[in-house]
């Protein structure tokens, strides 16, 4: 990925965040890592995100990412972890697993993801505001 060139006088103080949601079943399961946005209670939602410094075009593995989900009148914060390791160095992203709880109402679950790197840069991800593509709990 190429880093964008800063405009004169413009500070690159915000991280660029992007990602997706998938099923997070154990390895070998037919639906593991399959893109999806509709989940039933008890199913594992996988959040995969990246946070990039716009100046360098690179990520800092020490960056902290947190998912903030709003449902049933409460906000649930889920910290993400760096997925990259010695056996899988190509996995340059963060992950978090959230099993849909029994008290989650059916319908859209609104969420955002925030990030902060060791240098104080921050960023926020919000999914497109299109109902058909939102994280949705189904019966």
Q: What residue ranges belong to the model's regions?
A:
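Short, solvent-exposed loop/turn segments at the edges of extracellular beta-sandwich modules
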Residues: 55, 118-122
């Amino acid at each position: 990925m190429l880093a964008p060139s800063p405009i004169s006088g413009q500070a690159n103080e915000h991280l660029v965040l992007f990602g997706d949601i998938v099923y997070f079943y154990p390895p070998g399961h037919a639906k593991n890592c399959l893109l999806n946005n509709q989940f039933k209670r008890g199913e594992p939602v996988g959040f995969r995100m990246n946070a990039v410094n716009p100046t360098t075009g690179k990520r800092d593995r020490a960056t902290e990412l947190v998912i903030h989900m709003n449902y049933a009148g409460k906000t649930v914060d889920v910290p993400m972890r760096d997925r990259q390791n010695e056996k899988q160095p190509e996995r340059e992203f963060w992950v978090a697993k959230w099993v849909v709880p029994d008290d989650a109402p059916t319908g859209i679950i609104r969420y955002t993801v925030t990030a902060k790197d060791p240098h104080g840069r921050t960023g926020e991800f919000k999914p497109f505001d299109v109902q058909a593509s939102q994280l949705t709990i189904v019966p």
